[in-house]
Structures are given as structure tokens and as C-alpha cells.
Amino acid sequence: MGRDTIADILTSIRNANMDKKGTVRIASTNITENIVKILLREGFIENVRKHQENNKYFLVSTLQHRRNRKGRYRTILKRISRPGLRIYSNYQRIPRILGGMGIVILSTSQGIMTDREARLEGIGGEILCYIW
């Protein structure tokens, strides 16, 4: 039985956010790197760097700070498709989170992308998670 690396990323970020940690360390795979790049581009995390320790690579992510307030952003990350129950959608039925304020991360034939990119490309895929 394999590990669910996507759920591990989301849980690590959620736990660090609730515990008011500034950084989170995630095991580096191709999928995790692509998801973290999307989170960085969309502004949910502030900085990412790759770290090597005993021939294993890790991604060290700095979480986004609130301006003019103490604490972190309240980011909600929800895993949708999981190894036991895959959820697929075509590009017309990709859900909109909070009227477009949140993002949906999809795994498509063109790679991992957000819901906006998938709608522009006109392709659907597996719905990995919701973030808002």
C-alpha cells in the first residue's frame, strides 16, 4: 500500500498553519513540486527552497503572513480525489470555489494545473484538491 503524498502535503501545511509555524518541510517528488509551484504562484505560500539531506530531497516552504495582523492566513485545504475514490471532471464541470476566489488543483494530461488554466486549455482531469 502506497502513501498519499498529496494528502501529506495538505496535512503538513494545514497543521503548520494551525500551529502558527513559519515553515513546513515536505518530501520532494514531481507531484509535490508541481503542487507547491502552484501554491507559490497563487500566493498561498511565500517562498520555497529545495533542501538535500542524506540523498533525500525536501521542499522547505515559508507560509504566507498576514499584513497588519498577527498570525497566518486561514487557508483551507481539502483533498478531493484520493487513492480509494478517484474523482474526475471535464472542463465544463470543474467546480468554482467561492465564486472563483479559491482554486481547484487538477491532474490533467498536460500536467498538474489550476481550474482556470484547465478551463482555458479546454481539458478536464482528476480533481486533486480545493484550496481557499
Swiss-Prot record:
Keyword rRNA-binding recorded: yes
Organism superkingdom: Eukaryota
Gene3D superfamilies: 3.30.1370.30, 3.30.1490.10
Coiled coil: none
Any Pfam family matching the protein: Ribosomal_S8
Compartment(s) of residence: Plastid, Chloroplast
Swiss-Prot/TrEMBL GO biological process terms: translation
Main localization of the protein described in the UniProt heading: plastid
Keyword Metal-binding among record annotations: no
GO cellular component terms attached to this protein's record: chloroplast; ribonucleoprotein complex; ribosome
Assembly notes: Part of the 30S ribosomal subunit.
Family: Belongs to the universal ribosomal protein uS8 family.
Protein's job: One of the primary rRNA binding proteins, it binds directly to 16S rRNA central domain where it helps coordinate assembly of the platform of the 30S subunit.
Protein's UniProt name: Small ribosomal subunit protein uS8c
The species this protein was found in: Calycanthus floridus var. glaucus
Gene that encodes it: rps8
